[in-house]
């Protein structure tokens, strides 16, 4: 691992964290991703691995304050699009597993296949919007 850190965001009174690990190569990132759940990601340049609906010791995830998962990146693909894409997977995992949404909300029924469609939209739209703003002379700030 080249680098590792945590990012956090507070929503509706709940602070949630995601671990971020950066690897030198795609191969190293893919090997690391496989250690979390045994699944290969042969076509991926980045990945998200959620820590599940329950945490060690049987504590419900809703009351757990630790990281909800890990985003695995490689040095050569740390673009806004890729990072936004993987953070979308993290957000969907938080929504689904931590019950941020209303318990009767059928949203989860529409996001199958690993949430790839919304992650691609968010990643692409975010990258293109930031590029357009930058080209027009706007300063894009963190907050």
Spell out what each predicted region is.
Residues 131-143:
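Long, well-structured alpha-helical subdomains associated
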Residues 18-22, 71-72, 83:
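Hydrophobic beta-strand residues in large extracellular and virion-surface proteins
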